[in-house]
A protein has these predicted regions:
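Cytosolic juxtamembrane helix and N-cap/initiation of the first transmembrane helix
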Residues: 1-23, 147-148
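Transmembrane alpha-helix entry/boundary detector in multi-pass membrane proteins
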Residues: 14-15, 33-57
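Alpha-helical transmembrane segments
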Residues: 18-29, 134-142
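Transmembrane alpha-helical segments of multi-pass membrane proteins
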Residues: 23, 51, 76-92
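C-terminal TM-helix exit segments that contain a strictly Trp-centered aromatic cap at the helix terminus
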Residues: 33, 82-104
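Non-cytosolic membrane-interface motifs at loop->transmembrane helix junctions
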Residues: 41-51, 75-76, 107-108, 124
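Canonical alpha-helical transmembrane segments
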Residues: 54-70, 76
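Alpha-helical membrane-associated segments of multi-pass integral membrane proteins
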Residues: 104-150
């Protein structure tokens, strides 16, 4: 293993670099989630789910990335797949158990003229589709884990 970080980075496959970028995105999402959930964390247990998952993804995913060729890829795939569950639960909780109605509400805003709120006060409810960010991170991560390249050696 290279001791120089630049050499180490250059030795990584494209897939490993993509996973590293996704983990960086998860770090930013964790910081944003902590800020956005600051009040609700004291009110309900399920507000902790995305923070716990993002922290697990960073710590477990970072360790797994270092062992990419020795089982780390499979661990990362499982962690990224878990993101789909967390995203779905988040949409469920953000919508108060009525995801279809809230998704319809989000999509119907395209019919509103710019500058109008459609009768919904900004900040009066959690953003229904925000948890789908975990679907995006999970999708990119899974593609990187399941796409084989010549540099991966497996």
């Amino acid at each position: 293993m290279a001791t120089n970080p630049v050499v180490w980075w250059r030795e990584r496959s494209l897939n490993e670099r993509v996973v590293a970028a996704v983990l960086g995105g998860a770090a930013l999402l964790l910081a944003e989630l902590r800020f956005e959930h600051r009040e609700v964390l004291g009110e309900t247990w399920h507000a902790w789910l995305p923070l716990g998952y993002a922290a697990l993804l960073l710590v477990g995913g970072g360790a797994a990335l270092l062992r990419w060729q020795r089982g780390g890829r499979r661990i990362l795939a499982a962690l990224f797949a878990l993101g789909f569950v967390i995203g779905a639960l988040g949409i469920w909780f953000h919508s108060g158990g009525h995801p279809v109605a809230h998704v319809w509400s989000v999509l119907s805003t395209w019919q509103l003229p710019p500058g109008q709120n459609g009768g919904i006060k900004v900040g009066s409810q959690p953003p229904a589709l925000a948890p789908a960010a975990f679907w995006g991170l999970g999708s990119i991560g899974l593609i990187a884990c399941f796409t084989r390249t010549s540099h991966d050696g497996t």
